[in-house]
């Protein structure tokens, strides 16, 4: 792994408005998230219970980003939130932890994804011990 030699935070960067000859239609803000998944805008929502459920994931997907449905609910409800997004034929992510209790969640969501030919499973690598 290459060591990070410099890092910036939001406070380190300031964007100053300035006149430009470049038109918005000439700008490409897309990002290749995976080999087969390209987003129109480089925006992924946080997989937090106060941030992303179906409504937010729909709004972000319509804008060209990716909403990631949080995992702080039972598996059935998480799949219901995913279905809300998929009903509108949009892409969506689903957060799944890495702890032993999360394997069942991953299996159920993977089965749903494979059965319904869906897009993406988003993994959060967080162990169960981080919450205890």
Model region roles, listed by residue range:
Residues 1-43:
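An N-cap/entry alpha-helix motif that binds or orients negatively charged groups
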Residues 27-69:
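N-terminal cofactor/phosphate-binding cores enriched in small/glycine residues
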């Amino acid at each position: 792994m290459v060591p990070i030699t410099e890092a910036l935070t939001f406070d380190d960067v300031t964007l100053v408005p300035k006149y430009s000859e470049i038109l918005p239609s000439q700008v490409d803000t897309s990002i290749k998230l995976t080999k087969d998944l390209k987003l129109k805008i480089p925006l992924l929502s946080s997989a937090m219970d106060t941030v992303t459920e179906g409504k937010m994931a729909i709004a972000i997907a319509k804008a060209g980003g990716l909403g990631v449905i949080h995992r702080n609910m039972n598996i059935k409800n998480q799949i219901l939130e995913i279905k809300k997004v998929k009903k509108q034929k949009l892409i969506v992510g689903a957060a799944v932890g890495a702890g032993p209790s999360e394997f069942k969640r991953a299996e159920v969501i993977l089965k749903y994804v494979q059965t319904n030919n869906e897009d993406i499973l988003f993994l959060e690598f967080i162990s169960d011990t981080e919450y205890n």
